[in-house]
Swiss-Prot record:
Its cofactor is heme b. Binds 2 heme b groups non-covalently. This is Cytochrome b. One of its GO terms (biological process) is mitochondrial electron transport, ubiquinol to cytochrome c. InterPro entries: Cyt_b/b6_C, Cyt_b/b6_C_sf, Cyt_b/b6_N, Cytb/b6-like_sf, Cytochrome_b, Cytochrome_b_C_euk/bac, Cytochrome_b_N_euk/bac, Di-haem_cyt_TM. The keyword Transcription does not apply. A ubiquinone binds at residue 201. GO terms for cellular component: mitochondrial inner membrane; respiratory chain complex III. The keyword NADP does not apply. The gene is MT-CYB. It is found in: Mitochondrion inner membrane. Heme b b566 binds at residues 97, 196.
Protein backbone atom coordinates (compact mmCIF):
# COMPACT_ATOMS: atom_id res chain seq x y z
CA UNK A 1 0.00 0.00 0.00
CA UNK A 2 2.83 2.41 0.90
CA UNK A 3 4.45 1.85 -2.51
CA UNK A 4 1.21 2.70 -4.37
CA UNK A 5 0.62 5.70 -2.11
CA UNK A 6 4.05 7.14 -2.82
CA UNK A 7 4.60 6.01 -6.42
CA UNK A 8 1.24 6.15 -8.25
CA UNK A 9 1.10 9.49 -10.17
CA UNK A 10 -2.45 10.34 -9.07
CA UNK A 11 -2.49 8.90 -5.54
CA UNK A 12 0.93 10.52 -4.96
CA UNK A 13 -0.73 13.97 -5.30
CA UNK A 14 -3.34 13.09 -2.66
CA UNK A 15 -0.59 11.63 -0.45
CA UNK A 16 1.49 14.82 -0.58
CA UNK A 17 -1.58 16.98 0.08
CA UNK A 18 -3.51 15.11 2.79
CA UNK A 19 -1.48 12.20 4.18
CA UNK A 20 2.29 12.75 4.36
CA UNK A 21 1.97 16.54 4.33
CA UNK A 22 4.37 18.00 6.95
CA UNK A 23 2.17 20.15 9.21
CA UNK A 24 3.08 22.41 12.17
CA UNK A 25 2.49 20.50 15.42
CA UNK A 26 0.79 23.43 17.16
CA UNK A 27 -1.97 24.57 14.77
CA UNK A 28 -5.22 25.13 16.68
CA UNK A 29 -8.87 24.57 15.76
CA UNK A 30 -8.78 27.87 13.85
CA UNK A 31 -6.96 25.91 11.14
CA UNK A 32 -9.98 23.57 10.79
CA UNK A 33 -11.99 25.97 8.67
CA UNK A 34 -10.13 25.25 5.42
CA UNK A 35 -11.31 21.64 5.43
CA UNK A 36 -14.77 22.71 6.63
CA UNK A 37 -15.03 25.06 3.64
CA UNK A 38 -14.14 22.11 1.40
CA UNK A 39 -16.93 20.11 3.05
CA UNK A 40 -19.38 23.02 2.61
CA UNK A 41 -18.46 23.25 -1.08
CA UNK A 42 -19.10 19.52 -1.54
CA UNK A 43 -22.47 19.76 0.23
CA UNK A 44 -23.48 22.76 -1.90
CA UNK A 45 -22.47 21.09 -5.19
CA UNK A 46 -24.28 17.84 -4.35
CA UNK A 47 -27.49 19.41 -3.02
CA UNK A 48 -27.40 21.97 -5.85
CA UNK A 49 -27.09 19.22 -8.45
CA UNK A 50 -30.21 17.47 -7.14
CA UNK A 51 -32.11 20.77 -6.96
CA UNK A 52 -31.13 21.57 -10.56
CA UNK A 53 -32.75 18.29 -11.66
CA UNK A 54 -36.16 19.63 -10.60
CA UNK A 55 -35.78 23.41 -10.94
CA UNK A 56 -36.96 25.34 -14.00
CA UNK A 57 -35.28 28.66 -14.82
CA UNK A 58 -38.32 30.36 -16.31
CA UNK A 59 -40.04 33.34 -14.68
CA UNK A 60 -43.49 31.72 -14.96
CA UNK A 61 -42.51 28.41 -13.33
CA UNK A 62 -39.38 29.10 -11.18
CA UNK A 63 -41.30 29.87 -7.96
CA UNK A 64 -43.68 26.92 -8.51
CA UNK A 65 -40.77 24.55 -9.22
CA UNK A 66 -39.20 25.41 -5.84
CA UNK A 67 -42.57 24.78 -4.14
CA UNK A 68 -42.81 21.49 -6.10
CA UNK A 69 -39.34 20.46 -4.86
CA UNK A 70 -40.38 21.08 -1.25
CA UNK A 71 -43.80 19.42 -1.54
CA UNK A 72 -43.55 16.58 -4.08
CA UNK A 73 -39.92 15.51 -4.49
CA UNK A 74 -38.70 12.81 -2.09
CA UNK A 75 -36.74 14.65 0.62
CA UNK A 76 -36.85 17.73 -1.62
CA UNK A 77 -37.52 19.94 1.41
CA UNK A 78 -34.37 18.54 3.06
CA UNK A 79 -32.21 19.10 -0.04
CA UNK A 80 -33.55 22.63 -0.53
CA UNK A 81 -33.03 23.69 3.10
CA UNK A 82 -29.60 22.04 3.28
CA UNK A 83 -28.62 24.07 0.21
CA UNK A 84 -30.05 27.36 1.55
CA UNK A 85 -28.66 26.98 5.08
CA UNK A 86 -25.48 25.34 3.76
CA UNK A 87 -24.73 28.71 2.14
CA UNK A 88 -25.00 30.37 5.56
CA UNK A 89 -22.65 27.80 7.11
CA UNK A 90 -20.30 28.34 4.14
CA UNK A 91 -20.12 32.07 4.87
CA UNK A 92 -19.73 31.57 8.64
CA UNK A 93 -16.71 29.33 7.91
CA UNK A 94 -15.43 31.82 5.30
CA UNK A 95 -15.57 34.78 7.70
CA UNK A 96 -13.88 32.78 10.47
CA UNK A 97 -11.23 31.54 8.01
CA UNK A 98 -10.46 35.09 6.83
CA UNK A 99 -10.57 36.38 10.42
CA UNK A 100 -8.02 33.71 11.40
CA UNK A 101 -5.81 34.83 8.48
CA UNK A 102 -5.93 38.45 9.62
CA UNK A 103 -5.30 37.56 13.29
CA UNK A 104 -2.29 35.32 12.67
CA UNK A 105 -0.79 37.32 9.79
CA UNK A 106 -1.41 34.62 7.17
CA UNK A 107 -1.78 37.41 4.59
CA UNK A 108 2.02 37.46 4.39
CA UNK A 109 1.72 34.36 2.18
CA UNK A 110 0.72 36.69 -0.64
CA UNK A 111 -0.15 34.23 -3.44
CA UNK A 112 -2.33 32.09 -1.15
CA UNK A 113 -3.98 35.21 0.32
CA UNK A 114 -4.77 36.80 -3.07
CA UNK A 115 -6.17 33.50 -4.34
CA UNK A 116 -8.35 33.43 -1.23
CA UNK A 117 -9.69 36.92 -2.04
CA UNK A 118 -10.53 35.78 -5.59
CA UNK A 119 -12.34 32.79 -4.05
CA UNK A 120 -14.24 35.07 -1.67
CA UNK A 121 -15.48 37.21 -4.57
CA UNK A 122 -16.43 34.08 -6.56
CA UNK A 123 -18.40 32.60 -3.64
CA UNK A 124 -20.18 35.92 -3.04
CA UNK A 125 -21.13 36.14 -6.75
CA UNK A 126 -22.42 32.55 -6.68
CA UNK A 127 -24.47 33.15 -3.52
CA UNK A 128 -25.98 36.35 -4.94
CA UNK A 129 -27.07 34.62 -8.15
CA UNK A 130 -28.42 31.65 -6.20
CA UNK A 131 -30.60 33.98 -4.12
CA UNK A 132 -32.28 35.22 -7.31
CA UNK A 133 -33.31 31.73 -8.50
CA UNK A 134 -36.38 31.02 -6.28
CA UNK A 135 -37.94 34.13 -7.93
CA UNK A 136 -39.59 35.44 -4.77
CA UNK A 137 -40.07 39.15 -4.03
CA UNK A 138 -36.67 39.59 -2.37
CA UNK A 139 -35.00 37.56 -5.15
CA UNK A 140 -36.38 39.87 -7.82
CA UNK A 141 -35.85 43.18 -6.03
CA UNK A 142 -32.46 42.15 -4.67
CA UNK A 143 -31.35 41.34 -8.22
CA UNK A 144 -32.79 44.63 -9.51
CA UNK A 145 -31.12 46.79 -6.85
CA UNK A 146 -27.69 45.12 -6.92
CA UNK A 147 -27.36 44.85 -10.72
CA UNK A 148 -28.58 48.46 -11.01
CA UNK A 149 -25.50 49.58 -9.04
CA UNK A 150 -23.42 48.96 -12.17
CA UNK A 151 -25.22 51.88 -13.83
CA UNK A 152 -23.05 54.12 -11.59
CA UNK A 153 -20.04 53.29 -13.81
CA UNK A 154 -19.41 56.35 -16.01
CA UNK A 155 -20.20 56.19 -19.77
CA UNK A 156 -20.83 52.43 -20.03
CA UNK A 157 -22.96 51.90 -16.88
CA UNK A 158 -26.46 51.88 -18.39
CA UNK A 159 -25.40 49.78 -21.39
CA UNK A 160 -23.63 47.32 -19.07
CA UNK A 161 -26.72 46.89 -16.86
CA UNK A 162 -29.00 46.25 -19.85
CA UNK A 163 -26.44 43.80 -21.24
CA UNK A 164 -26.40 41.86 -17.93
CA UNK A 165 -30.22 41.93 -17.72
CA UNK A 166 -30.63 40.85 -21.34
CA UNK A 167 -33.35 43.49 -21.69
CA UNK A 168 -34.66 46.63 -20.04
CA UNK A 169 -35.43 45.02 -16.68
CA UNK A 170 -34.74 41.87 -14.65
CA UNK A 171 -36.74 39.25 -16.58
CA UNK A 172 -36.64 35.77 -18.19
CA UNK A 173 -33.22 36.29 -19.81
CA UNK A 174 -31.73 37.44 -16.47
CA UNK A 175 -33.07 34.43 -14.57
CA UNK A 176 -31.85 31.95 -17.20
CA UNK A 177 -28.31 33.36 -17.31
CA UNK A 178 -28.13 33.61 -13.50
CA UNK A 179 -29.05 29.92 -13.29
CA UNK A 180 -26.36 29.05 -15.86
CA UNK A 181 -23.71 31.05 -13.97
CA UNK A 182 -24.87 29.74 -10.59
CA UNK A 183 -24.45 26.19 -11.90
CA UNK A 184 -20.98 26.64 -13.44
CA UNK A 185 -19.33 28.86 -10.79
CA UNK A 186 -19.01 26.20 -8.03
CA UNK A 187 -16.93 24.07 -10.40
CA UNK A 188 -14.73 27.07 -11.19
CA UNK A 189 -14.47 27.64 -7.42
CA UNK A 190 -13.34 24.00 -7.00
CA UNK A 191 -10.54 24.60 -9.52
CA UNK A 192 -9.55 27.82 -7.73
CA UNK A 193 -9.49 25.93 -4.41
CA UNK A 194 -6.90 23.55 -5.88
CA UNK A 195 -4.78 26.56 -6.92
CA UNK A 196 -5.25 28.01 -3.40
CA UNK A 197 -3.95 24.72 -1.92
CA UNK A 198 -1.11 24.58 -4.45
CA UNK A 199 0.12 28.00 -3.29
CA UNK A 200 -0.37 27.04 0.37
CA UNK A 201 1.73 23.88 0.02
CA UNK A 202 4.55 25.90 -1.55
CA UNK A 203 5.10 27.78 1.72
CA UNK A 204 3.52 25.42 4.26
CA UNK A 205 0.94 26.40 6.86
CA UNK A 206 1.29 29.31 9.25
CA UNK A 207 0.86 28.55 12.98
CA UNK A 208 -0.41 30.39 16.11
CA UNK A 209 3.07 31.51 17.19
CA UNK A 210 3.84 33.04 13.77
CA UNK A 211 7.33 31.51 13.94
CA UNK A 212 8.98 29.18 11.42
CA UNK A 213 7.84 25.64 12.24
CA UNK A 214 10.19 23.66 9.94
CA UNK A 215 11.92 22.15 12.97
CA UNK A 216 8.67 20.82 14.43
CA UNK A 217 6.43 19.20 11.81
CA UNK A 218 4.15 16.16 12.07
CA UNK A 219 2.36 14.20 9.31
CA UNK A 220 -1.14 15.44 8.46
CA UNK A 221 -2.57 11.91 8.76
CA UNK A 222 -3.69 10.68 11.30
CA UNK A 223 -3.32 13.74 13.58
CA UNK A 224 -5.15 16.38 11.58
CA UNK A 225 -7.44 14.05 9.61
CA UNK A 226 -9.07 13.00 12.89
CA UNK A 227 -9.14 16.62 14.07
CA UNK A 228 -10.80 17.70 10.80
CA UNK A 229 -13.30 14.86 11.15
CA UNK A 230 -14.38 16.22 14.55
CA UNK A 231 -14.79 19.69 13.00
CA UNK A 232 -16.83 18.18 10.16
CA UNK A 233 -19.13 16.38 12.62
CA UNK A 234 -19.69 19.61 14.59
CA UNK A 235 -20.41 21.54 11.37
CA UNK A 236 -22.88 18.90 10.13
CA UNK A 237 -24.57 18.84 13.55
CA UNK A 238 -24.99 22.63 13.50
CA UNK A 239 -26.23 22.54 9.89
CA UNK A 240 -28.78 19.79 10.57
CA UNK A 241 -30.07 21.56 13.71
CA UNK A 242 -30.58 24.64 11.54
CA UNK A 243 -32.20 22.68 8.69
CA UNK A 244 -34.49 20.48 10.80
CA UNK A 245 -35.55 22.92 13.54
CA UNK A 246 -35.13 26.47 12.19
CA UNK A 247 -35.00 26.18 8.36
CA UNK A 248 -36.33 29.68 7.66
CA UNK A 249 -34.71 31.64 10.48
CA UNK A 250 -32.01 33.13 8.21
CA UNK A 251 -34.29 33.65 5.19
CA UNK A 252 -36.61 36.52 4.35
CA UNK A 253 -40.40 36.02 4.63
CA UNK A 254 -40.82 38.20 1.50
CA UNK A 255 -39.25 35.44 -0.55
CA UNK A 256 -42.35 33.29 0.03
CA UNK A 257 -44.27 35.82 -2.08
CA UNK A 258 -43.84 35.31 -5.86
CA UNK A 259 -41.87 38.06 -7.63
CA UNK A 260 -44.00 41.04 -8.62
CA UNK A 261 -42.34 43.88 -10.57
CA UNK A 262 -45.29 46.18 -9.72
CA UNK A 263 -44.99 45.85 -5.95
CA UNK A 264 -41.80 46.91 -4.13
CA UNK A 265 -41.17 45.35 -0.68
CA UNK A 266 -40.86 47.95 2.14
CA UNK A 267 -37.28 46.94 2.99
CA UNK A 268 -35.08 45.49 0.26
CA UNK A 269 -32.10 43.69 1.80
CA UNK A 270 -29.76 40.85 0.82
CA UNK A 271 -29.03 37.68 2.80
CA UNK A 272 -27.45 38.22 6.25
CA UNK A 273 -23.90 37.45 5.05
CA UNK A 274 -23.92 40.47 2.69
CA UNK A 275 -25.44 42.94 5.16
CA UNK A 276 -22.08 44.39 6.35
CA UNK A 277 -21.14 45.27 2.74
CA UNK A 278 -24.69 46.51 2.04
CA UNK A 279 -24.47 48.83 5.08
CA UNK A 280 -21.16 50.26 3.77
CA UNK A 281 -22.79 50.76 0.34
CA UNK A 282 -25.77 52.61 1.84
CA UNK A 283 -23.67 54.78 4.15
CA UNK A 284 -22.31 56.81 1.21
CA UNK A 285 -24.85 59.24 -0.34
CA UNK A 286 -23.17 59.13 -3.78
CA UNK A 287 -24.02 56.11 -5.98
CA UNK A 288 -20.58 55.59 -7.54
CA UNK A 289 -18.87 56.26 -4.19
CA UNK A 290 -21.10 53.64 -2.57
CA UNK A 291 -20.25 51.04 -5.23
CA UNK A 292 -16.51 51.72 -4.83
CA UNK A 293 -16.80 51.46 -1.03
CA UNK A 294 -18.72 48.18 -1.44
CA UNK A 295 -15.97 46.66 -3.62
CA UNK A 296 -13.24 48.11 -1.40
CA UNK A 297 -14.82 46.60 1.74
CA UNK A 298 -13.59 43.20 0.48
CA UNK A 299 -10.71 44.31 -1.75
CA UNK A 300 -9.05 46.07 1.20
CA UNK A 301 -7.93 42.59 2.31
CA UNK A 302 -5.51 42.59 -0.65
CA UNK A 303 -3.71 45.62 0.85
CA UNK A 304 -3.13 43.98 4.24
CA UNK A 305 0.40 42.70 3.39
CA UNK A 306 1.33 46.31 2.44
CA UNK A 307 -0.21 47.70 5.64
CA UNK A 308 1.70 45.22 7.86
CA UNK A 309 4.18 47.32 9.87
CA UNK A 310 4.97 44.97 12.76
CA UNK A 311 8.16 42.93 13.02
CA UNK A 312 6.00 40.07 14.33
CA UNK A 313 3.80 38.04 12.02
CA UNK A 314 0.57 37.51 13.96
CA UNK A 315 -1.05 39.57 16.71
CA UNK A 316 -0.83 36.80 19.34
CA UNK A 317 1.72 38.79 21.36
CA UNK A 318 0.56 42.31 20.38
CA UNK A 319 -2.10 43.60 22.83
CA UNK A 320 -2.65 47.02 21.16
CA UNK A 321 -3.32 45.49 17.73
CA UNK A 322 -5.43 42.78 19.40
CA UNK A 323 -7.67 45.51 20.84
CA UNK A 324 -7.97 47.06 17.35
CA UNK A 325 -8.78 43.64 15.88
CA UNK A 326 -11.64 42.95 18.28
CA UNK A 327 -13.02 46.47 17.79
CA UNK A 328 -12.98 45.67 14.04
CA UNK A 329 -14.92 42.42 14.66
CA UNK A 330 -17.49 44.33 16.78
CA UNK A 331 -17.70 46.98 14.05
CA UNK A 332 -18.48 44.32 11.43
CA UNK A 333 -21.26 42.95 13.66
CA UNK A 334 -22.68 46.49 13.99
CA UNK A 335 -22.53 46.91 10.18
CA UNK A 336 -24.35 43.57 9.75
CA UNK A 337 -27.10 44.79 12.10
CA UNK A 338 -27.35 48.19 10.35
CA UNK A 339 -27.58 46.56 6.91
CA UNK A 340 -30.85 44.95 7.96
CA UNK A 341 -32.37 48.17 9.35
CA UNK A 342 -34.48 50.73 7.44
CA UNK A 343 -32.78 53.85 6.02
CA UNK A 344 -33.76 56.34 8.75
CA UNK A 345 -32.33 58.14 11.78
CA UNK A 346 -30.38 56.96 13.83
CA UNK A 347 -29.40 53.98 11.64
CA UNK A 348 -27.99 56.15 8.83
CA UNK A 349 -25.54 57.87 11.19
CA UNK A 350 -24.57 54.63 12.98
CA UNK A 351 -23.87 53.05 9.56
CA UNK A 352 -21.70 55.98 8.47
CA UNK A 353 -19.67 55.97 11.70
CA UNK A 354 -19.27 52.16 11.54
CA UNK A 355 -18.16 52.34 7.86
CA UNK A 356 -15.54 55.01 8.58
CA UNK A 357 -14.36 53.01 11.62
CA UNK A 358 -14.02 49.84 9.49
CA UNK A 359 -11.67 51.45 6.96
CA UNK A 360 -9.86 53.58 9.58
CA UNK A 361 -8.94 50.57 11.75
CA UNK A 362 -7.50 48.59 8.81
CA UNK A 363 -5.74 51.47 7.00
CA UNK A 364 -4.69 53.75 9.89
CA UNK A 365 -4.95 52.32 13.40
CA UNK A 366 -3.61 48.77 12.95
CA UNK A 367 -0.46 49.90 11.05
CA UNK A 368 0.18 52.63 13.68
CA UNK A 369 -0.33 50.08 16.48
CA UNK A 370 2.28 47.85 14.79
CA UNK A 371 4.85 50.68 14.77
CA UNK A 372 4.13 51.54 18.44
CA UNK A 373 4.55 47.87 19.47
CA UNK A 374 7.85 47.66 17.56
CA UNK A 375 9.11 50.69 19.53
CA UNK A 376 7.93 49.33 22.88
CA UNK A 377 9.67 45.99 22.25
CA UNK A 378 12.78 47.66 20.80
CA UNK A 379 12.31 45.85 17.47
CA UNK A 380 12.64 48.95 15.30
Amino acid sequence: MTIIRKKHPLIKLINHSFIDLPTPSNISSWWNFGSLLGLCLMIQILTGLFLAMHYTSDTTTAFSSVAHICRDVNYGWLIRYMHANGASMFFICLFLHVGRGVYYGSYNMIETWNMGIVLLFAVMATAFMGYVLPWGQMSFWGATVITNLLSAIPYIGTTLVEWIWGGFSVDKATLTRFFAFHFILPFIITALVLVHLLFLHETGSNNPSGLNSDADKIPFHPYYTIKDLLGALLLLTALMILVLFFPDILGDPDNYTPANPLNTPPHIKPEWYFLFAYAILRSIPNKLGGVLALILSILILAFMPLLHTSKQRGITFRPITQTMYWILVSDLLILTWIGGQPVEYPFIMIGQVASITYFAIIVIFMPIAGIIENNILGLD
